[in-house]
Curated annotation (Swiss-Prot):
Organism taxonomic ancestry: Archaea, Methanobacteriati, Methanobacteriota, Stenosarchaea group, Methanomicrobia
Keyword check for Ribosomal protein: yes
PANTHER family: 60S RIBOSOMAL PROTEIN L4
Swiss-Prot/TrEMBL GO biological process terms: translation
Coiled-coil region list: none
Superkingdom in the source lineage: Archaea
A GO term for molecular function: structural constituent of ribosome
Pfam families named in the record: Ribosomal_L4
InterPro entries found in the cross-reference section: Ribosomal_uL4, Ribosomal_uL4_dom_sf, Ribosomal_uL4_euk/arc_CS, Ribosomal_uL4_euk/arch, Ribosomall_uL4-arc
One cellular component (GO) term of this entry: ribosome
Role this protein plays: One of the primary rRNA binding proteins, this protein initially binds near the 5'-end of the 23S rRNA. It is important during the early stages of 50S assembly. It makes multiple contacts with different domains of the 23S rRNA in the assembled 50S subunit and ribosome.
UniProt protein name: Large ribosomal subunit protein uL4
Length: 249
């Protein structure tokens, strides 16, 4: 299995043999588990005060008075403490001791990563995610791409490769999130576009492009390759990143 290595102007420089990882079996079930396990590590434990709603001297009147046997305040008939009362405790509040992290076996996690890498070369899966691209997959740049320092040069290279339309798609997808997340630092939602994987340092010049993630090959994980648990992200590799992928096989 071979791939064409492109120059920064989009011309074919030469061909490269792809490592065994690109022949990995597609396992969407493992990919989903690996992504959910990663996401669960970012959950923050939270819980209510155990005394919330309990700070009252209310007591039940007992039987024989024709009223419900619930705790009532001393100076009247107002109900307190129970979940159905105003100001009462919560019925089943969140608890800090709840185990939030989802575990996954080490071998399953590694297989999920290999499977997600292979899935990034399936044109049908990539298009199903909504990505826009031209040519065959995988997309590979020569190592000079890692030396680019200006965002304008990155845009020119992506345009020559025929994938900048996908960045524009992500740029136009930004919208205000529905729900309480708007008050919690998550006001906007935006689609993911290109993932740029380099052999050395991450490509800093691509950080401000809409929906683009730039990482070193040793920082790869299932969530980067399958955002939202859906595999087939449009991925651009450098030649040195492809060579280092042999360590994952």
């Amino acid at each position: 299995m071979k791939a064409q290595v492109r120059t920064l102007t989009g011309e074919i420089a030469h061909e490269i043999d792809l490592p065994e990882i690109f022949r990995e079996e597609y396992r969407p079930d493992l990919i989903k588990r690996a992504v959910l396990a990663l996401q669960s590590t970012r959950f923050q434990p939270h819980g209510t005060n155990p005394y919330a709603g309990m700070r009252t001297s209310a007591e039940s009147w007992g039987s024989g008075r024709g009223a419900a046997q619930v705790p009532r305040l001393k100076n009247g008939s107002r109900v307190a403490r129970v979940p159905q009362a105003t100001g009462g405790r919560a019925a089943h509040p969140p608890k800090v001791e709840k185990i939030l992290v989802k575990e996954i076996n080490r071998k399953e996690k590694r297989k999920a990563l290999r499977s997600a890498v292979a899935a990034s070369t399936y044109p049908d899966l990539v298009r199903e995610r909504g990505h826009l691209f031209e040519g065959d997959l995988p997309l590979v740049f020569e190592d000079r791409f890692e030396e680019v320092t200006r965002t304008g040069d990155v845009i020119a290279a992506l345009t020559a490769l025929g994938v900048y339309a996908d960045v524009e798609r992500a740029k136009g997808s930004r919208k205000v999130r529905a729900g309480r997340g708007t008050m919690r630092g998550r006001r906007y939602k935006q689609r993911k576009s290109v993932l740029i994987v380099t052999g050395g340092e991450p490509l800093r010049a691509a950080r401000n492009l809409a929906g683009v993630d730039a990482v070193a090959v040793d920082q790869l994980n299932a969530e980067l390759l399958a955002p939202g648990t859906q595999a087939g992200r449009l991925t651009i590799w450098t030649e040195s990143a492809i060579r280092r992928l042999e360590e994952f096989s």
